[in-house]
Swiss-Prot record:
Keywords: ATP-binding, Kinase, Nucleotide biosynthesis, Nucleotide-binding, Transferase. This is Thymidylate kinase. It comes from Chlorobium phaeovibrioides (strain DSM 265 / 1930) (Prosthecochloris vibrioformis (strain DSM 265)). PROSITE patterns: THYMIDYLATE_KINASE. One of its GO terms (molecular function) is ATP binding. The gene is tmk. Its EC number is 2.7.4.9. GO terms for cellular component: cytosol. It catalyses: dTMP + ATP = dTDP + ADP. InterPro entries: P-loop_NTPase, Thymidylate_kin-like_dom, Thymidylate_kin_CS, Thymidylate_kinase. The keyword Transmembrane helix does not apply. Belongs to the thymidylate kinase family.
């Protein structure tokens, strides 16, 4: 089973992934947690390039770097793990590319979708949890975590984090459009709820989905 978590930076994905992985392992399941970009030696090196604040990367270059990282991760790690029956939990997948590079950077969606199809080989998540929080609130969380002032030119921010509020508003609206296109795959959760409330929703949803598959 492939489970993905999506949402703008600061939504709380990493926390929920850790809790879900621990929950599933406690039930005796084999679980692999991964992040995008990353997960292989090549992909982690691409991640460093993408997030380095001194790099000035064009939107198309950014898209292709993310896609190269994804192609490596899918073929080298995700597909083999799924074949062995491992539950894979992924922090971001191609929906992030659609939201960030498509809606955020303005890349033509048909072109973007072709590149996504090539990099994933058609692999899709079984379920995607979207942690919904307004960009303004998410960014306040993010800056608070780093204990830095709310300023996008701060040297402690990575290249993506320096993109600005208008960019994140476009990304947020992009996610809303994506979910409307595939409502059966997405589970939208209010990210302003407590960590435990969100976790309970996630585990309950997965339990119900698995019960539905077995019936």
């Amino acid at each position: 089973m492939l489970i993905t978590f999506e949402g703008i930076d600061g939504a709380g994905k990493s926390t929920q992934i850790r809790k879900l992985a621990a929950h599933l392992r406690s039930q005796g399941q084999e679980v692999l947690t991964l992040r995008e970009p990353g997960g292989t030696e090549v992909a982690e090196n691409i991640r460093l390039i993408l997030l380095e604040s001194r790099h000035d990367i064009t939107p198309v270059g950014e898209l292709l770097l993310f896609s190269a990282s994804r192609a490596e991760l899918v073929n080298e790690v995700i597909r083999p793990a799924l074949k062995e029956g491992t539950t894979v939990i992924l922090d971001r997948f191609f929906d992030s590319t659609t939201a960030y590079q498509g809606y955020g950077r303005g890349i033509d969606l048909p072109t973007l979708n072709s590149i996504i199809a090539l990099s994933t080989g058609g692999l899709k998540p079984d379920i995607t949890f979207y942690l919904d929080i307004l960009p303004e609130e998410a960014l306040i969380r993010k800056f608070s975590e780093k204990s830095i002032p709310l300023a996008f030119d701060n040297d402690e921010l990575d290249r993506m984090e320096r993109s600005g509020l208008d960019f994140y508003r476009k990304v947020y609206e992009g996610y809303r459009c994506i979910m409307q296109e595939e409502p059966d795959r997405f589970v939208s959760i209010n990210a302003r709820k407590s960590i435990q409330e969100i976790h309970t929703t996630v585990t309950k949803t997965l339990k119900e989905q698995r019960a539905g598959r077995q019936s």
